[in-house]
Amino acid sequence: MQKLRNIAIIAHVDHGKTTLVDKMIMQSHVLRDNAKNSGELILDNNDLERERGITILSKNVSVIYKDCKINIIDTPGHADFGGEVERVRNMCDGVLLLVDAFEGTMPQTRFVLQKALSLGKKPIVVINKVDKPNCRPEVVNEQVFDLMFSLGATEEQLDYKTIYGSAKQGWMSHVWNQPTDSISPLLDTILDEIPEPAVVEGTPQMLIPSLEYSSYIGRIAVGKVTRGELKTGQNVTLAKRDGVTMQKSRIKELMVFEGLGKKKVDAVPCGEICALIGIDGFEIGDTICDYENPEPLPPIAIDEPTMSMLFTINNSPFFGKDGKYVTSRHIKERLDRELEKNLALRVEPGANADSFIVFGRGVLHLSVLIETMRREGYELQVGQPKVIVKEIDGKKCEPIEEMTVDCPQEYSGTVIELATKRKGTLTNMETNGDRTRLEFSIPSRGIIGLRSNMLTATAGEASMTHRLKGFEPWTGEIEMRVNGSSISGETGTAYAYSIDKLQDRGRFFISPMEQVYEGQVIGEHTRQNDITVNVTKAKQLTNMRASGSDEKTSIAPPKVFSLEEALEYIKEDEYVEVTPHAMRLRKILLNETDRKRASK
């Protein structure tokens, strides 16, 4: 039987997990040589992942090294996709903790490491990016040790091996200033340090922590066989999460991961990660077990969502111009499909038949879903993100996050002021060279819309990360966006002539010759109140000319929002209208008279 190792790679966002896996794939010659220089990451194969440079979904690949098969699971680093990270832990026998040699340990590192240590996994620490100038590998290694100690690691876990290297340049070494020519030292350490999966004899058992979706076959269950072995055509029982419901089923096909793809097999031994086809109606957390006497495994606990958002059909005057799928039935079917594979998501029906309340782990988590739907041809409108409030011991409680901000020293005062305005409290402050790291405890409500203000205030130099700490008593009202909106009073084409005349009233979000409709938010007013303006007036052409009266108009460029910025910007009485080709802000009530009546 082939030797086997199962490892997961965990790290903070952008510390180089996916790049490292790509190098492992190349070292084991899975790809043809000419595919190696494409410059893009092999694993981030979803357009959104490539554009944003982040991993959203966990992936499985395997490499063969010295006759041993290594199954590698690449996981996302963002806490918003924590649902993806948590469920994958059950499939691995050890973890590679990847840390940036310059940035050191970050909040997300702590979040993912805590999960792995609590399951008793032994880590191998990889200090990556040692080719960066001003990096401090030894200091970072001590930081990791302190972090593991503070998270209550056992003595065995603290006796970890450290490897230094640069995934981008493709080398790893036991000493940081002695580069080698390959990543073999890392692969050797994996073989020596990570235990082989335990082989347990008996009736088959497999927990389903992950799934894949194929438009040909439907849903495919992915997991690790923890006891016995599975065979093609075998009759099994599907034990549901509740531990009571049992469904009889049969395995049609079995596959194992080989390189970047999958390979059909007749039997899967204990300890191997495999994909099952032919099991109907399974959910994540269910167990596949013996046909005669089923013994389910305990299901996985997943963190609760912290934020909700209203999704509704597009009913603006420009409805149906761009999108293929515009009705509530389409949106409902798409959300139901997403629920099948997106663990941390929940959907409830809204106040009327056309709206749905979608719960998720944060603005990024929900905006990735909206962006994916938009690219598939859906039109929809989304409301302002709201945090989920719980009642604990008769007290109103809200989600509180730990936020870390790295910024140049001269901006630290501005950053502290921004955070404390939003009910944040400073818990720690470290200065390293000319950069300062500030740690805050801040309500989730306060983080909505904070990132764009933070970047503006620090000239784009600050980097901000946060993770959920728990629920704490309500901190009181937070002053959010101060300025009112400029709203179009007419439907038609926006003209440069009108925009120029109104520039002193505030910034615009539209360009000349764009189509606008009544009730669309087309700019930000300089004052606190909303203002209705008409940008559809063109210049009246007469025969009279006065010299010098026809100067060229100079119009400031419009402010363009990304989807997250738009969601964080809108007020309670506004929607973001999302279509495949456009994104507009609008008032929920388009007519000015209706808005006045509602505000009384």
Regions found by a protein language model. Name each.
Residues 37-40, 125, 151-163, 197-207, ...:
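Interdomain boundary/hinge elements
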Residues 205-309, 319-321, 483, 492-542, ...:
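Conserved nucleotide-binding/hydrolysis modules and their immediate coupling elements
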Residues 1-99, 103, 143, 211-214:
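P-loop NTPase switch module centered on the Walker A-proximal segment
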Residues 23-24, 62, 84-87, 91, ...:
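Alpha-helical scaffold elements adjacent to nucleotide-binding pockets in ATP/GTP-utilizing enzyme cores
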